[in-house]
């Protein structure tokens, strides 16, 4: 059992205060425990900073939950990292201080080794392969359930696009261009190993530190989808985006299991359906918005985009694939994913 952090204590207090201010004198608003005597259950959804299509999808989830439960369950949001970064939000969901969060699969690696598979570079042949895997319940349900003993499980995924390198001082064409470069990566052992194999120097850090680190030359570049360029402003200092497309790491919505068990079967089913339907909404919204983001990055920041032959990148990171396909803990899952792309 993890020790309660100071952030958790502070967040619990703020949640209590926010809950009181949100409820006011309306006796129809209740916690799950009071649901048998009151009309509406309020469930709390906290999330870190996100692109607009993802925010819209999370709001659509709340709308669908309210609609499908005839208003008996409603979602209250704590946006933009008010309660902490992704690691803290997972812990808050685990403890029941909040009921839902949405985080990168990479952030879940330290809670379940199964999520590490998504950080394997070039795991998917293309976008079609990615969606085929993510929509396969035989593959995904065991991954979602892999954290059940920790008090939470996955509900659904959101598309977060492909991840490529973007740099301050010039484009990337081959792995040689990364040699000696300090590259920000997510706090993932697999992502760190990937950059090392490509010749770079990985610098693990949270997303909120990247802009100032690029600006101060603490790092030479980073890797992410195109939304960081205009929406997060990174294109103002890192103007070279190179499509090596090394990973497609999904976002995952997780839910506290103790809360789920207090809901009626009908309410639980409604939440599960709403989550899946919000995924369809998010995928469509993300695809539309990414093109707008690229155009704005070019127009407002002068970002240059270049295509890359990723063959030498794939060859360089082959040892990571060897590790996963030979490790007893991963080989069955790895094989199932590869079969979907055959």
What are the roles of these predicted feature ranges?
Residues 18-22:
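C-terminal motif of bacterial Sec signal peptides marking the signal peptidase cleavage site
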Residues 129-144:
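A gly/proline- and charged-residue-enriched helix-loop-helix capping module
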Residues 9-17:
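Hydrophobic helical h-region of N-terminal Sec-dependent signal peptides
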């Amino acid at each position: 059992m993890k020790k309660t952090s100071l952030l958790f204590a502070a967040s619990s207090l703020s949640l209590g205060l926010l809950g009181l201010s949100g409820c006011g004198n309306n006796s129809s608003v209740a916690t799950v425990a009071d649901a048998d005597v009151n009309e509406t259950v309020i469930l709390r959804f906290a999330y870190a900073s996100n692109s607009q299509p993802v925010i819209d999808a999370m709001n659509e989830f709340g709308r669908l939950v309210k609609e499908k439960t005839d208003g008996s369950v409603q979602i209250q949001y704590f946006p933009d990292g008010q309660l902490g970064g992704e690691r803290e939000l997972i812990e808050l969901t685990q403890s029941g201080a909040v009921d839902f969060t949405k985080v990168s699969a990479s952030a879940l690696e330290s809670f379940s080794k199964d999520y590490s598979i998504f950080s394997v570079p070039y795991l998917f042949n293309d976008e079609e392969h990615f969606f085929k895997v993510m929509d396969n319940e035989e593959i995904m349900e065991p991954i979602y359930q892999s954290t059940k003993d920790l008090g939470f499980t996955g509900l659904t995924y959101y598309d977060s696009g492909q991840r490529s390198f973007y740099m301050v001082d010039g484009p990337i064409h081959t792995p040689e261009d990364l040699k000696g470069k300090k590259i920000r990566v997510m706090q993932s052992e697999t992502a760190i190993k990937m950059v090392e194999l490509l010749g770079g120097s990985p610098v693990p850090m949270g997303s909120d530190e990247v802009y100032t680190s690029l600006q101060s030359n603490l790092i030479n570049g980073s890797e992410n989808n195109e939304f960081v360029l205009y929406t997060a402003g990174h294109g103002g200092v890192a103007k070279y985006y190179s499509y090596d497309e090394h990973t497609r790491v999904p976002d995952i919505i997780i839910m506290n299991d103790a809360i789920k068990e207090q809901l009626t079967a009908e309410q639980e089913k409604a939440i599960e359906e709403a989550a899946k339907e919000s995924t369809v909404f998010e995928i469509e919204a993300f695809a539309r918005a990414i093109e707008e983001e690229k155009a704005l990055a070019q127009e407002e920041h002068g970002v240059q985009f270049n295509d890359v032959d990723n063959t030498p990148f794939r060859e360089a990171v082959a040892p990571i694939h060897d590790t996963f396909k030979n490790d007893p803990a991963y080989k069955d899952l790895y094989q199932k994913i590869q079969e979907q792309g055959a």
